[in-house]
């Protein structure tokens, strides 16, 4: 009977020993991975990864940290303009986190270039770039862990909101100082001051109705075409299909747009406006009847042509819209 407690103790040690050793080995592997990531982050805010690094540090357990990965194609022969623009914003976000007082080892920023890790693209069945995915500390990425680039754009502030939503890590985006705005404002003030100085005795140009009307028209066209949305969201200029090479300038959803789409809509609105101006001049001017007829026909043609195109763009974004005019 005295040997029974000793036997039980031996059995417990025999069962718990391997488990404890495995747990200790797991903690050592995790510590090595975190130390390696921290060392790379201290040198570069965005860690460049190939297939081996991605599988070992992002996919393979154990892991108690989240990794935000940008899948991109930055090599010049890929001709991915959007990738370069998105990379600049991603670098701003990663640098803001790296130099933040709240920096911890709970989240890291990484990048996989197609030419350095094409096997990773194949493993994830990924066929477009740039793409942002959050690999959480526990479990596999869910649907919300893939960033909706076409809807939100790639501005660092938008990425920071998405990161906060997926990881509960709030990053205050700090951009490098941009002196372009103050310089342009100073140049504008200098031009205005120069005009006032040179024509101080004659300021009739300030009361020029045509000039003010043209300036107001430019402002209205810019605002109605979606320039302010672009400024806030920072969408890509266009989207190039990596397989077919086809470039899309019109976004297929009503919830997003490309910068090129703004320029197209501005052009169409400008064409309609020009047509209306010609119709007004044809009806009110004192020119001979022949010229007024030409202006009237040209005005009607511009309004019909550009309005049809504008309605066609609207139909392509709002699927199921029943009305069209000349163009489907």
Curated annotation (Swiss-Prot):
Pathway field: Protein modification; protein glycosylation
Principal localisation: membrane
Any one GO BP annotation for this protein: protein N-linked glycosylation via asparagine
Keyword Glycoprotein: yes
UniProt keywords, alphabetically: Cell membrane, Disulfide bond, Endoplasmic reticulum, Glycoprotein, Magnesium, Membrane, Signal, Transmembrane, Transmembrane helix, Transport
Any one cellular-component term (Gene Ontology): oligosaccharyltransferase complex
Domain of life of the organism encoding this protein: Eukaryota
Entry-linked CDD domains: TRX_family
UniProt cross-references to SUPFAM superfamilies, sorted A to Z: Thioredoxin-like (SSF52833)
Membrane-spanning ranges: 178-198, 212-232, 258-278, 294-314
Every Thioredoxin domain range: 40-168
Its membrane topology: Multi-pass membrane protein
Protein family membership: Belongs to the OST3/OST6 family.
Subunit structure: Accessory component of the STT3B-containing form of the oligosaccharyltransferase (OST) complex. OST exists in two different complex forms which contain common core subunits RPN1, RPN2, OST48, OST4, DAD1 and TMEM258, either STT3A or STT3B as catalytic subunits, and form-specific accessory subunits. OST can form stable complexes with the Sec61 complex or with both the Sec61 and TRAP complexes.
UniProt name for this protein: Dolichyl-diphosphooligosaccharide--protein glycosyltransferase subunit MAGT1
């Amino acid at each position: 009977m005295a040997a029974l407690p000793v036997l039980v103790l031996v059995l417990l040690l025999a069962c718990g020993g391997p488990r404890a050793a495995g747990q200790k080995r797991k903690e050592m592997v995790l510590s090595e991975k975190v130390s390696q990531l921290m060392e790379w982050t201290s040198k570069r805010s965005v860690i460049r990864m190939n297939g081996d690094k991605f599988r070992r540090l992002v996919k393979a357990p154990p892991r108690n940290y989240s990794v935000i990965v940008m899948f991109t194609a930055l090599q010049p022969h890929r001709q991915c303009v959007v990738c370069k623009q998105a990379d600049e914003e991603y670098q701003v976000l990663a640098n803001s986190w790296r130099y933040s007082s709240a920096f911890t080892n709970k989240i890291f920023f990484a990048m996989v270039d197609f030419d350095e890790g094409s096997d990773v693209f194949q493993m994830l069945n990924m066929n477009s770039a740039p793409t942002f995915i959050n690999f959480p500390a526990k479990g596999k990425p869910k649907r919300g862990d893939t960033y909706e680039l076409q809807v939100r754009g790639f501005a660092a502030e938008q990425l920071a909101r998405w990161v906060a939503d997926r990881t509960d890590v709030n990053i205050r985006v700090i951009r490098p100082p941009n002196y372009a705005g103050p310089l342009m404002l100073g140049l504008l003030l200098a031009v205005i001051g120069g005009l006032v100085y040179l024509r101080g005795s004659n300021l009739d140009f300030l009361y020029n109705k045509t000039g003010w009307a043209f300036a107001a028209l430019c402002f209205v066209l810019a605002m109605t075409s979606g320039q302010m949305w672009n400024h806030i969201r920072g969408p890509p200029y266009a989207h190039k299909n990596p397989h077919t090479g086809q470039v899309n300038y019109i976004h297929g959803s009503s919830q997003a747009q490309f910068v090129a789409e703004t320029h197209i809509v501005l052009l169409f609105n400008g064409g309609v406006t020009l047509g209306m101006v010609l119709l007004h001049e044809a009806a009110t001017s004192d020119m001979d009847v022949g010229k007024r007829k030409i202006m009237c026909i040209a005005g009607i043609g511009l309004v019909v042509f550009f309005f049809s195109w504008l309605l066609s763009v609207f139909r392509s974004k709002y699927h199921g819209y029943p009305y069209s005019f000349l163009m489907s």
